[in-house]
A protein has these predicted regions:
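Active-site loop ensemble at the mouth of alpha/beta enzyme cores that anchors a bound cofactor
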Residues: 111-112, 117-128
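Alpha-helix N-cap/helix-start motif
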Residues: 22-26, 122, 199
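An anion-binding loop in the catalytic cleft
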Residues: 123-219
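Short secondary-structure junctions and interdomain/linker hinges
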Residues: 80-84, 92, 96, 120, ...
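Donor/substrate-binding cores of folate-linked one-carbon enzymes
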Residues: 1-110, 114-116
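A generic secondary-structure signal marking the coil-to-beta-strand transition
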Residues: 11, 54-55, 109, 116-118, ...
């Protein structure tokens, strides 16, 4: 409530995991990776009645590399966010901060992650699927259905296997390092998985104990 936010003399400050007004909401770090962003960041801001809509104070950018996952970005952002909050408090106390209103017309949203968010749609292109896997690694994890069982997927790389006649989601090859799945624009090699009730492991280790079949359609 507005009356609560107005109690502190210097206002209520929030640390948000995006460069506002982009990615307002519950899961900005995950969605920035899922959407293929190359840069994200931290914004300190005044809390307001609307969702992440308050005036901004300071920002700091954080690079998203091709290898970053939700776990690694979370850790980078935690350090950046802590330092930015200290800078914000110091400048707030000194009276040197400017309030910067958000451009509400430019706002985008990062809704809460649900289990269904992680259900892989194999008709999408390979990079979009890789980004989904990265953005939900380690939790809740992207997943597919193999022979009526959930199979979580934590790693995938673009494969040069050609399978133009295969259906999207079809296992087109089982090789030493993993299994190859047909996607909307080519194939992916799945490199790290976790079966229901099992441990997370590299796919080559998983295949030593599980015989995956070519031609099976992942759902």
């Amino acid at each position: 409530p507005k009356e609560i936010l107005e109690i502190p003399k210097l206002g209520c400050i929030n640390v948000h995991g995006s460069l506002l007004p982009k990615y307002r909401g519950a899961a900005p770090m995950q969605w920035s990776i899922i959407d293929g962003e190359k840069v994200t960041g931290i914004t300190t801001m005044y809390m307001a009645k609307g969702l992440d809509s308050g005036d901004m104070l300071l920002k700091a950018e954080v690079e998203i590399t091709d290898e970053d996952t939700f776990a690694t970005i979370h850790d980078k952002m935690a350090v950046t966010g802590a330092n930015l909050l200290l800078d914000t408090l110091d400048q707030l106390e000194a009276g040197t901060l400017e309030r910067i209103p958000q451009d509400h017309d430019a706002a985008t949203y990062a809704p809460m992650i649900t289990k269904e968010t992680g259900h892989i749609d194999w008709s999408k292109n390979r990079q979009d699927i890789i980004n989904l896997i990265r953005g939900l690694n380690p939790v809740p994890a992207a997943y597919t259905i193999y022979e009526e069982e959930v199979l979580k997927i934590f790693g995938a790389v673009i494969s040069d296997v050609q399978a133009d006649d295969a259906a999207n989601g079809e296992i087109v090859a089982v090789v030493k390092k993993g299994f190859v799945v047909k996607c909307g624009d080519g194939c992916l090699l799945i490199t790290e998985v976790q079966a229901r009730g099992g441990k997370r492991m590299m796919t080559d280790a998983y295949l030593r104990g599980h015989a995956m079949k070519e031609g099976i359609l992942l759902q």
